Every structure is written in C-alpha cells, then in structure tokens.
C-alpha cells in the first residue's frame, strides 16, 4: 500500500502500471494522486513510470486520470499540439508534441521543468536526448530546437517561484 501524503504525479512511459489490482494504465496515462490518498501499485510484466513526489498541497483533493494517447485530450494552440494535464493558480502542466526543426520557446517568470518523453532537443551545442530533465529557474528563457521526429515533452510551469516562496517562509 502506497500513501501519497504530499501527493504524487505519475506518467506511464512503458508497460502497464496497475493500481489496486484492478485498474490497468498502459503507456501514456497520466495519474495525479492527491494528498493522503492510498493505493496499491503493481505491474504484472513491469512498467517504467515517471514519478514526481510532493506535488500537491493538502487542499488539492481531486484524483486525475488522463489517457494522453486519446486524440480527444489534445488541442491545437496556435502551431502547438498540447495535451493539458493540470492547471491551477500556481501550476500549469501539459504535454507538447513537436516536429523536427520546430523551436520550443517558453518565457516563464516562474520557472519551467521539461522532461523529454521521446525525441531530442538541442540548445546551442548541448543535446538533450529522451529521458533528459531540464529545470530552468524563474525569469529564464527556454529556447530549444527539436532534432527528431515524434518529440514529446512533459512541461510544468508557473510553480518554481511559488515553491521557492513557500520554502523561504518555512525556513524563516
């Protein structure tokens, strides 16, 4: 039994992730478990999951399940293919699909985190392959060129400045 005291976020990258012996989530599912939720996790044949711990306040109570493989969950924002995952006053999390030579640009006053689910990004001479994690602090400009077909990113913004403020309050 897993207890998600501070809340967790999971993205199934491969295999099948099972919850409570009855709910199977294949690759592409996004799961958001609120503060103090309980569930039993397993996988019959194994699963690779991207997990972020301590992602929610005790005030967030909604469990979220999104199949990111379902086209109905994707929208076009300008020239961007976006799968919104979660949005609040202090967080915006989404997946973004990009084409080769496309530029991923994000100007975030509050910081940004990027996980490369598939494909590859490049910034100058630096190459970021699948599985790379990029965190830019508040007031930094994200500007990356897409190098490969089928590049998909997990992107989280609007949260780092708020997290830093909470950290400072707790440590004062």
Residue ranges and their predicted role:
Residues 1-20, 108-124, 130:
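Glycine- and acidic-residue-biased ligand/ion/polar-headgroup-sensing regions
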Residues 22, 26-28, 101, 126, ...:
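Glycine-centered loop/turn motifs
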Residues 10-17, 25, 29-32, 49, ...:
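Short, structured motif recognition centered on aromatic/hydrophobic residues
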Residues 46-90, 94, 169-172:
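A short, N-terminal "cap"/entry segment at the start of jelly-roll beta-barrel domains
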Residues 3, 18, 30-41, 103-104, ...:
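Histidine-centered metal-chelating micro-motifs
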Residues 22-24, 35-60, 127, 138-167:
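Ligand-binding loop in jelly-roll beta-barrel domains
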Residues 73-123:
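Surface-exposed interaction/gating patches
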């Amino acid at each position: 039994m897993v207890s998600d005291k501070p809340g967790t976020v999971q993205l199934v990258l491969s295999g099948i992730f099972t919850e409570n012996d009855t709910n199977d989530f294949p690759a592409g599912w996004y799961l958001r478990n609120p503060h103090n939720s309980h569930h039993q996790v397993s996988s019959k044949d194994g699963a690779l999951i991207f997990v972020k711990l301590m992602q929610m306040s005790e005030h967030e109570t909604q469990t979220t399940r999104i199949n990111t493989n379902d086209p109905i969950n994707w929208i076009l924002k300008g020239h961007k293919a976006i799968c919104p995952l979660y949005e609040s006053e202090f967080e915006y999390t989404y997946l973004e699909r990009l084409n080769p030579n496309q530029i991923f640009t994000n100007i975030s006053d509050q910081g940004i985190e990027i996980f490369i689910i598939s494909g590859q990004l490049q910034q100058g001479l630096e190459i970021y392959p699948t599985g790379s994690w990029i965190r830019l602090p508040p007031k930094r400009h994200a500007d990356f060129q897409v190098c490969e077909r089928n590049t998909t990113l997990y992107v989280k913004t609007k949260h780092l400045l708020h997290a830093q403020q909470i950290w400072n309050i707790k440590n004062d």
